[in-house]
Regions:
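C-terminal outer-membrane/trafficking sorting elements
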Residues: 128-170
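A composition-driven surface/loop motif
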Residues: 1-127
Length: 170
């Protein structure tokens, strides 16, 4: 969707953009996506929002909530901001990957870096929570343990009669 002198997508009631496809929203000079006093959810799809003015924009930043869930989003807002004028931004199953270090700033009501709203090159990618998969050692550490998992000192002969785990075996 491409427009001149208007928002590519303008709405006044809560909206969810969803589906397996891609939405390309471009406005030559206003907002690519404009959530006027309401909430926006982007769920399990790809959204590319680009404008010389605002990329993805709320109205006042007093109550509008933006939720991005398992989605890929790029946003450009050349003069004002890529994602701005929202009260909150919730990311579920995705994270801001570009520019590095960018995050939602509640004072500026948008995605910012170094105290300024990000205006171009904003990328949010799904499947990157920022937490890596843990690496689990499959070998039990050598030693003598109680059934509660407490490590004991000394040898097995030094312990009182009972059940113990020795080198990972009862």
């Amino acid at each position: 969707v491409t427009t001149v002198k208007a928002s590519a997508l303008f709405f006044t009631k809560p909206l969810t953009i969803t589906g397996g496809g891609t939405l390309n929203a471009k406005s030559e000079d206003f907002c690519a996506i404009y959530a006027w006093g309401t909430d926006l959810t982007i769920d399990d799809c790809t959204v590319n929002a680009s404008s010389a003015g605002y990329g993805i924009n709320g109205d006042s930043g007093e109550s509008e909530k933006l939720t991005i869930r398992n989605a890929d989003v790029t946003a450009e807002g050349g003069q004002e901001g890529a994602i701005c004028n929202f009260y909150s931004l919730t990311l579920e199953g995705c994270t801001i990957t570009q520019p590095a270090g960018a995050a939602f700033d509640a004072t500026l009501n948008g995605v910012a870096l170094n105290g300024e709203l990000v205006k171009s090159g904003l990328t949010i990618a799904k499947g990157t929570s920022g937490i890596l998969q843990p690496t689990i050692s499959t070998t039990a550490p050598k030693g003598i343990y109680t059934l509660n998992g407490q490590k004991l000192r000394g040898t097995l002969r030094d312990q009182a009669k009972g059940l113990y785990i020795v080198s990972g075996k009862k």
